[in-house]
Amino acid sequence: MCGIFGYANFSKERSKDEIANIMINGLKRIEYRGYDSAGFCITDNTDRNFARIRAVGKVNSLYEIKNSQTSVDLTRKVLNHVSIAHTRWATHGQPSIENSHPLSSDENNSFLVVHNGIITNYKDLKVYLKKKGFTFESDTDTECAAKLALYFYREMERKKEETDFVAIVKNVVKHCEGAFAFVFASSLFPNELVTVRKSSPVLIGLKPSGKMSFDFFGVNYGDPADDTPTSLLDSPLAFSKSDRHGFDQNIDMMTRDVQDCTLHAHNKEPLEVFVASDASALIEHTRKVIFLEDNDIVHISNGNISIHRMHSKAKESGPEIREVKTIETELAAIMKGNYDHYMIKEINEQEESVVNTMRGRINFESLTVSLGGLKDHVSGIRKSQRIIFVACGTSYHASLANRALLEELLEIPVSVEIASDFLDRAPPIMRSDCVFFVSQSGETADSVMALRYCMSMGALCVGITNTVGSTISRETACGVHINAGPEIGVASTKAYTSQYIALVLVALQLSDQNLVKQARRREIMEGLKNISSQINRVLELSTSVKSLANGPMKDDASLLLIGRGYQYPTCMEGALKIKEITYIHAEGLAAGELKHGPIALVDDKLRIIFIATKDLLYDKTRNAMEQIFARGGRPIVICTEDISGDYAEYDTFVVPKTVDCLQGILTVIPLQLLSYHLAVAKGYNADFPRNLAKSVTVE
C-alpha cells in the first residue's frame, strides 16, 4: 500500500531531466504495491524551492506533465540534489491532485513529505494546527506531518534555538500515532533528507563511486529526555539536547565514524543515496542496502548519512549497528520480458520457482530434508503443545492447505488463523505454543502486529516469507525463506505454490525422527521430486483454459468452487484469484458443507467448478458432485488423469496425479490460469486489480 522513493546525488552531476526520470522510474518499479495517484518533487529554477509534479492515475502520466511544466529547466545540471516521490493508495481523501504526495507545509515548501501508513490521531492534530493558523489544502492525514514540521521549526526560531532537521522530525514523530514511514525534504535545509521508519518498511540504498570499505553503520541512541512522552494537546514542547546534531559539511573520502554515526564522503567522491519502501526500486541502481529498524531516523545531508533512534538506550535495547547488506535479486527478475502481464509470467515461472524453494534443502537420494533457518529451533518446535499459523489472504490459504499434513506427521494440534481476526480476539497464547507467521512480503501489517502480540506472550515465533530483511524475517526467532523470487503481480501465484512447498518441507523436517511416519515421508519426497515436471504439464492447459474464458463464462456473475480435504483450500485460493482480478463473485466451499445451505444456490444458470482427485475422500466428493448434476448445475471439473474418463461429458481440465498432500499445487494452477484469462477477456489489467495493493502495510 503506497510506495516511497527518494534520491539524493552528492558530487554527482545530473541534469534535472535525469533526476526526474530516475524518480518516475523508481515509482514504476513499485507500481505493483497498488496506487491511484503519484507524484514527485524536484528543485525549481531558483534551486532553492521545489516544484511538485503530481497526477491522478498511472505513473507514466508524470512524464508528460514533467515535460510540459515551465517551473523547472530540465536541461540544467546540478552537482547536489535531493528529491522524493510517492505512489498513493487512498486511505484518507479521494484520489486527487491535492491529495497526492509529496504534501507541503506551506507555499514556500518549507517542508515536503511522502508517507506510507496511517496517522491515527490526525484529526486531533489538524484541529490543533488550525487553531495555530495553519490551513490545509488536502483531505489527507499526511499533510499534518508537513505542517507539524513547520510548526516545530517556528517554535525553535521563536525560542531562538538552533534549528535542526532531525530534531524537527523527531518531534513530528513523537506527536503522530499509528504505523508509518516518512521521508522529508525541505527548502529550509537544502540537500538534506530525513527518513523515519515506524512499523512501515523503508530501506536505504548506497551507491558510492568506488568500492565500499565498510559494512555497517553505528547507531546514535537518543537522550533520556527523548523518552518523556510529549503532546501538543496537554503538555509543553520539549526539545532534548540530543536532538541537535552537528554534521560535517565537508565532502571527503568515504570513511565510517561509529562515534558520530556518520558516513563521510571525502575528496568530493560522488555518492548517490536511494530511499525506498521496496528493494525492487533499488536493484537497477545498487545492491548495497540498509534495512531500517522501527524507530530509526536516517539523516542524509550533503553526502553524509547518519542513523539515529527515537529513544535512549535506557528505554529500548537493540543492535548498535545497521549492517550494509547485498541484495541478490537480478533486474531481469522484476521485468515482464516477452509476457503481456507479470501475472502470466509468474504463473509460468512456477515450474522453476518450486525448484528454487527446494534447492539445497532436500536430498532426493538420501530422502532427507534440512532447513537451515530452523535448525537451531527444531527441538523447540517439536516440543510445542500446539502449532498456530497466522496469515492473511493467499498466505492463509497456503497455511490451511498444509494443516492436515502437519497434524498427520507431527501429531500436534494445528490451527490456522486469519491475522486480523486473531488480533481482534487476542486469544490466549502460551509459552509452549509455536506460532508460524506466513507472509509473502514479510510486512503484512496484521501479521506483524500478531507477531508482536505472540512475542509478548513468550511463544516461539517462526517466519515464512519471500523477502529478505522484512519485518517478519527479522523479528521472528527463526524461519524459512521461500525463494520464489520477486512477485510483482498483485494477485499472488508463484508465492502460493512456494509457500505450499516450504510448509511441506517444514512438516518433513520436523517429523524426521518419527519412525512410524517414514514411509509416508518417503512417499511425499518422491512426489516432490516430480512436482516441477508435473507443473510444466499443467501449464500446457493454458490454451484450453483461455478458450473457456473467452466464451460465455466471462459474462458470469457468480461462481462456486467446491472441493474436499486437501482441495478445499485450493478452492478458496482459486475463488480469491477470480475475485481479485476478474471482479466476478466467487466462493470456495467445502463439499461436505454443500447440503448445509449452499446447495440452495444450484440451478442451471450457476457455473460450478469441482475439484476431484482420486484420494481417500473421492467417493464423498463424487456424492456431492452427483447432487450438483441432479439439480442441473453446470460443472467444470478439474480432475486427476486416473479418473478423467468419469467426466468426459463436461468441461474438464486434467492434471497429473501426485501424492494427496501435494495435489493442491497442481490443481490450483488451472484456477490461476482461468482467473488470468478471464480478466484479459473482460478487458482488465491482471497486474493492477482495482482497489487492491500488493503489500498491505496498514491495518
Curated annotation (Swiss-Prot):
EC number(s) recorded for this UniProt protein: 2.6.1.16
Domain SIS: 377-516, 544-689
Keywords: Aminotransferase, Glutamine amidotransferase, Repeat, Transferase
Boundaries of every Glutamine amidotransferase type-2 domain copy: 2-303
UniProt keyword annotation of Nucleotide-binding present: no
Catalytic activity annotation: D-fructose 6-phosphate + L-glutamine = D-glucosamine 6-phosphate + L-glutamate
Gene3D superfamilies for this protein: Glucose-6-phosphate isomerase like protein, domain 1, Glutamine Phosphoribosylpyrophosphate, subunit 1, domain 1
PROSITE patterns xref list: GATASE_TYPE_2 (PS51278), SIS (PS51464)
Biological or metabolic pathway of the protein: Nucleotide-sugar biosynthesis; UDP-N-acetyl-alpha-D-glucosamine biosynthesis; alpha-D-glucosamine 6-phosphate from D-fructose 6-phosphate: step 1/1
GO biological process, one term: protein N-linked glycosylation
Top-level taxon of origin: Eukaryota
Molecular function per GO: carbohydrate derivative binding; glutamine-fructose-6-phosphate transaminase (isomerizing) activity
Active site annotation, chain numbering: 2
PANTHER family attached to this UniProt entry: GLUCOSAMINE--FRUCTOSE-6-PHOSPHATE AMINOTRANSFERASE, ISOMERIZING, GLUTAMINE--FRUCTOSE-6-PHOSPHATE TRANSAMINASE (ISOMERIZING)
Protein name: Glutamine--fructose-6-phosphate aminotransferase [isomerizing]
